[in-house]
Amino acid sequence: MPYIYMNITLAFVISLIGTLMYRSHLMSSLLCLEGMLLSLFTLNALLSLNMNFTLSTMVPLILLVFAACEAAVGLALLVMISNTYGLDYVQNLNLLQC
């Protein structure tokens, strides 16, 4: 396994561990989730370039679109929670239910 793939996989695992460890604050969870998506995008782009298959070049772009949508929804939730409660705890998400 080349070192670049091992480094990208290690970045994904570190972001996953960060998501599992620091899930009390919404901002840290969103940052770790973005790190996971960035490493997935990089790995996907490298693999699609190495495969030389023209249809596989669309997959990283689709993943990037989903990452942008996830970031927008996450930031909207963060702004709504911080304006309502003044804190960004994940526990406050349970208070948003009707």
Swiss-Prot record:
Record-level GO cellular component terms: mitochondrial inner membrane; respiratory chain complex I
Q: How does it sit in the membrane?
A: Multi-pass membrane protein
Gene3D superfamilies for this protein = 1.10.287.3510
GO terms for molecular function, please? NADH dehydrogenase (ubiquinone) activity
Chaperone among the record's keywords? no
> What coarse category fits the chief subcellular location reported for this protein?
mitochondrion
Q: Write out the GO biological process terms.
A: ATP synthesis coupled electron transport
Where can this protein be found? Mitochondrion inner membrane
Its transmembrane ranges are: 1-21, 29-49, 61-81
Write down the EC number. 7.1.1.2
Cystine crosslinks: none
Catalytic activity line of the entry = a ubiquinone + NADH + 5 H(+)(in) = a ubiquinol + NAD(+) + 4 H(+)(out)
What's in the keyword line of the UniProt record? Answer: Electron transport, Membrane, Mitochondrion, Mitochondrion inner membrane, NAD, Respiratory chain, Translocase, Transmembrane, Transmembrane helix, Transport, Ubiquinone
Q: What class of enzyme is it?
A: translocase
Quaternary structure (record): Core subunit of respiratory chain NADH dehydrogenase (Complex I) which is composed of 45 different subunits.
PANTHER family in the cross-refs: NADH-UBIQUINONE OXIDOREDUCTASE CHAIN 4L, NADH-UBIQUINONE OXIDOREDUCTASE SUBUNIT ND4L
Q: What does this protein do?
A: Core subunit of the mitochondrial membrane respiratory chain NADH dehydrogenase (Complex I) which catalyzes electron transfer from NADH through the respiratory chain, using ubiquinone as an electron acceptor. Part of the enzyme membrane arm which is embedded in the lipid bilayer and involved in proton translocation.
Q: Its family?
A: Belongs to the complex I subunit 4L family.
Q: What is this protein called?
A: NADH-ubiquinone oxidoreductase chain 4L
